[in-house]
Amino acid sequence: MARIFQPKKKTQLNTRHQAVQVERLDHHGAGIAYLKKKPLFIDGALPGEEVVTQLVEEKSKFARGKLIKILKPSEARVEPFCSHYHECGGCDLQHLNYDQQLTHKQQTLRQLMRKFAGSDIELGAPVLGESLGYRRRARVSLFVDKKTRQLHFGFRKKQSKQIAQVTDCPVLAPELNVLLPEIYSTLKAFKKPEQLGHVELVLGDNAPCITLRHLNKLTEKETNTLVELAKRHQASLYLMPETDQLDLVEGEVPFYQEAGVTVPFTPNNFIQVNQAVNQKMVAQAVDWLDPKSDERVLDLFCGLGNFSLPIAKRAKHVVGVEGVAEMVEKAVNNASLNQINNARFYHANLEQDFEGQVWAAEQFDKVLLDPARAGASGIIDQVSVLGARRIVYVSCNPATLARDSQSLLEQGYQLTKLGMLDMFPHTSHLESMALFEKS
């Protein structure tokens, strides 16, 4: 007999306002209260606060609420310094004083390592830079309202594809922030602003850099207007008519310097957002790795050579491996530019088994890993076959660091140092660094 499908009746969401006590923050900076013994996540709420919330989502194991009113504020609560904070999705912790932000991030890192890697270790001092004006790159979103023909210019709203109108960003480097209102006024005068994609801003040591992604060819007048804007600010200007095409039409190729090396890049290359923290991060990684003049070092996920090139100044030989072919080519060029002759670079897929790769047949004294947020799960189980006695793991996701750490511990390594790097102040995002050693 055929069964007749009957859709499950949806439970009516109770949207009435409810007062709750916030107990702690989750790893993403949301306040956690409990409603009927179920965790209730409330963005913008802080531990110790009594707040009024309205349910916006309810699942079998958790619920989410919207912050309506704060009945009893936390002593750690501060007034956000940005007028766009409650709308823009760029920052999510401006309402928490900076010292408490650091404490929260350190606790998050330690808790994740304890829970998933089974390792409880005291953290070293956090690596810090300036908490404002620190971003040396940002992508500005563009959208034209079909009805009003108004150009929206700014950053994505919180948990939305809509754009918050922003022409002033306190966490953006001043050299880039000053460009925002002028770029906006220039672009909104274009004949067909709906044919514009986005604006990429990046600050090199030599100059700020503006990149405009556009779908149709710009008029000569529009191009000249952008060139004049760039000249006024002594900026480089790239036009990007295709996803993989970059045309430098004004200024010079940007570069940054660190640890005695010069690293040229283009706007579509990955570089760390926070220059000051990046410099300290590289210095700490080299210090923890402690490469000797007779040692061979492997740098996995090497990018442009952010770590490889400074390490090569001290090691006998460095091998860098990267999954993006263009980055490998530029790493080779960067080594040549800096007259570094003891570094080789390879293109390889580091999301899968590296057995059979030429570089993997070699033995290394030390290894550095700097993977993307997904971590290094594709190769982490093989690291011990490389023979390294010391491994430095630089992570932009503490959850995947904790997961990969478990594998390294099972391979006989010991976690001897752990630290947090505040690459993104006023956000819940945290970077970390771990040192593993094998006797």
Swiss-Prot record:
Q: What class of enzyme is it?
A: transferase
Q: Which reaction does it catalyse?
A: uridine(1939) in 23S rRNA + S-adenosyl-L-methionine = 5-methyluridine(1939) in 23S rRNA + S-adenosyl-L-homocysteine + H(+)
Q: Which InterPro entries match?
A: 23S_rRNA_MeTrfase_RlmD, MeTrfase_TrmA_AS, MeTrfase_TrmA_CS, NA-bd_OB-fold, SAM-dependent_MTases_sf, TRAM_dom, U5_MeTrfase_fam
**Binding-site positions, [4Fe-4S] cluster:** C82, C88, C91, C169
> Domain TRAM spans what residues?
10-69
Q: Where is the active site?
A: C396
* UniProt keyword terms in alphabetical order: 4Fe-4S, Iron, Iron-sulfur, Metal-binding, Methyltransferase, rRNA processing, S-adenosyl-L-methionine, Transferase
Q: Which SUPFAM superfamilies match?
A: Nucleic acid-binding proteins, S-adenosyl-L-methionine-dependent methyltransferases
What CDD domains does the record tag this protein with?
A: AdoMet_MTases
Q: Does the keyword Lipid metabolism apply?
A: no
Q: Which GO terms describe its molecular function?
A: 4 iron, 4 sulfur cluster binding; iron ion binding; RNA binding; rRNA (uridine-C5-)-methyltransferase activity
Residues binding S-adenosyl-L-methionine: Q272, F301, N306, E322, N349, D370
Gene3D superfamilies, alphabetically?
2.40.50.1070, Nucleic acid-binding proteins (2.40.50.140), Vaccinia Virus protein VP39 (3.40.50.150)
- Task of the protein: Catalyzes the formation of 5-methyl-uridine at position 1939 (m5U1939) in 23S rRNA.
Which PANTHER family has this protein been placed in? 23S RRNA (URACIL(1939)-C(5))-METHYLTRANSFERASE RLMD (PTHR11061:SF49), RNA M5U METHYLTRANSFERASE (PTHR11061)
- Spell out the protein name for this chain: 23S rRNA (uracil(1939)-C(5))-methyltransferase RlmD
**Organism, as annotated:** Vibrio campbellii (strain ATCC BAA-1116)
